A protein has these predicted regions:
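Flexible, glycine/charged-enriched surface loops at secondary-structure junctions
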Residues: 81-89, 100-103, 180-181, 240-241, ...
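Catalytic-core signal marking the mid-to-C-terminal active-site face
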Residues: 14-16, 20-22, 28-47, 58-70, ...
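N-terminal intrinsically disordered, cationic/polar leader segments
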Residues: 13-64, 72-76, 82-97, 104-140, ...
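Short, Lys/Arg-enriched N-terminal segments with co-localized hydrophobic residues
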Residues: 1-11
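Glycine-rich phosphate-binding active-site loops on the catalytic face of alpha/beta enzymes
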Residues: 385-405
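Helix-rich catalytic cores of soluble enzyme domains
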Residues: 157-388, 392
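Short beta-alpha connecting loops at secondary-structure transitions
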Residues: 52-56, 330-336, 364-371, 399-411
Length: 530
């Protein structure tokens, strides 16, 4: 073939698949129509990933035994701190722990025994039942970035986030096929008072999307508000009997459980709502510089946190989390997508499976200030390690920039597009009779080509994953269209998704009740930006 024939392969259609036996027809605009079909906006959501590939396990059973023994030793000899939380200390005393001041020392085996009542899998229900997700087992649920105070877009650059930005991200998440979850604090709406912004964020998730979402954890009272709003959305009986919220409970590593996070955990666990118990690991700052030492601390912290959730309510759903990064010893900045982070992520996955708990880690992590090559490399490393590590709930799966300080609109759609590769990788290798393609190999024979054979004609539309964002055109076409880079293409896609967004239907009475709840709560307290 001539070099230019490669473009014919990429733009292949039902008709061109038969060119070996049929005369080529004149151009009639079909290519443009097919390109439009490929890039058309859809509000279809792919089902959560069900892996058909093995997990990547780098730790031997003997090594895991050592980590486990060391973690138990830490809990028994050093202990963990439950600060400003007398009720927690009393619960630990009653369970058999040794409590001195705010230090809780947990006898060997006690925390692990308490963890046994936590479920290995659970369902988080969405208001649209077709978008409910099962967390645990071989499944992977993808959720967007969480927590940045800043946003960035190609036109306005970096700025503080607003509630309008938050609502825009929720719409983008709803329109993103490969994203299963609406997330939580996709960005921090700094134009809304701190004590009221959780209400507006929850309202956005509940009304602008029908995917599952996360509750507020910044104060126990806000956790209670989250549950009460869910009771309006789903009904009190449904919330009583089902899990409708997943909530991020960060541990103050090393080995400190603060009263704010534990207060939120206590509310959610008591109501049978799921909590991610997640050490916040920055190697060299909040954990040892060594992988083995970090794994030991992570396991000790998670054992204590999960055990405490079960003291609140045995059987409450929990996810074993690990936010993992290391520190640049020259600048003090966090680093992402590194080999050490991968080792820890793989290792924690093995420890989570030993405990029989769902696992949260990884994401679209990067330290870059722009959605550039550095961001792409670091993000690719982080996403792929999450898939291979057996992660069940991946927070920060799209939109993360600048070490989590920034939520980027362009990177959100770039990452969301790439999440499609995780879905396809997770399928594994098809070994069906059709996939073995012996008939195609016989048909083509030595020296032929597969472009016109029956097997290609039957399968070419679904044989290869294809980005909805990237540019695959020849240089001349790309140049004529403005020589746009990926960020420019992403900016166009952001606008297209926003312009074609269609709000999911919601019972008007429920919508009105949510608005009334939010208005009443806001009216009952003065604004506070502290």
């Amino acid at each position: 073939f001539r070099a230019t024939d490669s473009y014919w392969v990429i733009a292949m259609t039902d008709e061109t698949a038969q060119t070996a036996t049929a005369p080529r027809r004149g151009r009639g605009g079909g290519g443009a129509a097919r390109r439009a079909e490929r890039t058309a906006v859809s509000i279809e959501t792919a089902k959560y990933i069900q892996r058909n590939i093995p997990n990547y396990e780098i730790m031997t059973e003997e090594a895991l035994d050592v980590i486990q023994a060391n973690a138990e030793q830490i809990l028994e000899e050093i202990g963990v701190a439950f600060v400003d939380n007398p009720a927690a200390l009393e619960r630990w005393k009653a369970a058999g722990a040794e409590v001195t001041g705010e230090r809780v020392r947990i006898p060997k085996g006690l925390a692990r025994k308490l963890c046994e009542t936590a479920p290995a899998t659970f369902t988080q229900h969405a208001r649209n039942p077709e978008r409910s997700v099962e967390i645990g087992g071989k499944n992977l649920v993808l959720a967007p970035v969480y927590g940045p105070p800043f946003v960035r877009d190609a036109e306005g650059g970096r700025r503080y986030a607003t509630i309008a930005d938050f609502q825009k991200f929720v719409k983008l998440g709803y329109m993103s096929k490969w994203l299963h979850h609406s997330g939580g604090t996709v960005c921090e709406p700094t134009d809304v008072p701190v004590n009221k912004r959780h209400l507006d964020m929850l309202l956005a998730h509940m009304t602008l999307s029908d995917k599952p979402f996360m509750g507020s954890v910044t104060e126990p009272e806000r956790a209670q508000d989250s549950i009460e709003m869910c009771e309006i959305l789903f009904g009190k009986d449904f919330v009583r009997d089902n899990t409708v919220l997943v909530n991020l409970i960060n541990i103050n590593s090393p080995m400190t459980f603060d009263s704010t996070m534990m207060g939120a955990l206590e509310i959610y666990a008591a109501h049978n709502q799921a909590c991610i118990i997640s050490p916040f690991i920055v190697g060299g700052a909040m954990a040892p510089v060594s992988v083995a030492g970090t794994l030991t601390q992570v396991l000790a912290e998670v054992l204590a946190g999960v055990a405490y959730s079960q003291l609140i309510r045995a059987g409450a759903p929990v996810i074993m989390g690990a936010f993992v990064t290391s520190i640049d010893m020259n600048s003090g900045a966090p680093t992402f997508g590194t080999p050490e982070a991968a080792h820890i992520t793989y290792g924690v996955g093995q420890l989570a499976r030993r405990l029989g708990l769902p696992y949260r880690s990884a994401g679209s992590f990067c330290g870059s200030k722009l959605p550039d090559a550095q961001a792409a490399y670091e993000t690719a490393n982080s996403l792929n390690m999450g898939l291979l590590a057996g992660v069940n709930f991946m927070l920060h799966a799209c939109g993360w920039l600048e070490g989590g300080l920034v939520a980027s609109f362009e990177k959100f759609v770039m990452d969301a597009d790439q999440l499609g590769t995780l879905h396809h990788l997770a399928k594994g290798v098809d070994m069906s009779e059709d996939a073995q393609a012996l008939d195609a190999i016989r048909e083509v024979g030595p020296g032929g080509h597969y472009l016109g054979c029956a097997h290609t004609h039957a399968n070419f539309k679904t044989a290869f994953w294809r980005s909805d964002l990237f540019d695959y055109k020849p240089f001349e076409t790309w140049d004529e269209e403005g020589a746009r880079d990926t960020q420019a293409l992403a900016s166009i896609r952001v606008q297209k998704l926003v312009d074609t967004y269609q709000q999911p239907t919601l019972d008007p009475e429920i919508h009105a009740a949510l608005l009334a709840y939010v208005d009443a709560k806001k009216a009952a307290m003065p604004d506070s930006f502290m």
